[in-house]
Every structure is written in C-alpha cells, then in structure tokens.
C-alpha cells in the first residue's frame, strides 16, 4: 500500500535517481519544439480492434437523432451593417440584440 501513497508525497526522493519511476517523457527542461506526451504507468496502446470499434462508434454517433437534427438546421448568414449609416436607435437595437443573454458584469464601487 505504500506505493499508492508515494504518488501523493510532496518530494519524491527518487526523482533524480538513475532508476526513476517517471513514465512517458524525456524529462528535460529544454523545449524540443515537438509535442511531448505524458503517459501513466498503466498506459497501453490501443489495439487495432479498439480502433475499429471507434470507427463503428463514430458511425453510430453520426446517425444519432441530435446529429440528424443539426444537419437539417441551416446556418444563418450574418449580415454586415455599416455603422456609420445607422441611426442611433438602429445602432442601439443591434447592440442590445448582440448582448442578449450575456451576463451582467457591472461592478458597484
């Protein structure tokens, strides 16, 4: 059981030892410019069967009701309004419609 609690220790005395138990990275303080992957001790590569199951799950997701509903919806085209040609009332109306549903971030001093 002591190995489980070692994960919560503040200082790992074996951190800089030659036989460190850190997994999945090069552990240098230099930036290599590439993506570094950190894996847990229990990490395993997915098998080809798992990958095939993932493709099957993707097909099922695409055929779900929510995906079919979203594909039926049309994307509305945004209109571009020239602010310099708007009256003050029109500008205020557009401004308020853009802020609809936004939280009130007013601060009282």
Swiss-Prot record:
Residues 37-81 are annotated as: Disordered. Residues 41-64 have a biased composition (Basic and acidic residues). It comes from the Eukaryota. Belongs to the SPG4 family. Stationary phase-essential protein not required for growth on nonfermentable carbon sources. This is Stationary phase protein 4. The lineage of its organism: Eukaryota, Fungi, Dikarya, Ascomycota, Saccharomycotina. The gene is SPG4.
């Amino acid at each position: 059981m002591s190995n489980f609690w070692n994960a919560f220790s503040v200082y790992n005395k074996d951190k800089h030892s030659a036989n460190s138990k850190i997994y999945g990275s090069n552990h240098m303080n230099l930036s290599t410019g590439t993506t570094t992957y950190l894996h847990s001790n229990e990490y395993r590569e997915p098998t080809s069967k798992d990958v095939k199951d993932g493709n099957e799950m993707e097909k099922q997701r695409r055929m779900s009701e929510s995906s079919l509903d979203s594909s039926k919806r049309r994307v509305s085209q945004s209109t571009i309004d020239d602010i310099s040609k708007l009256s003050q009332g029109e500008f205020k109306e557009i401004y308020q419609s853009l802020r609809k549903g936004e939280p009130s971030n007013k601060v009282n001093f």
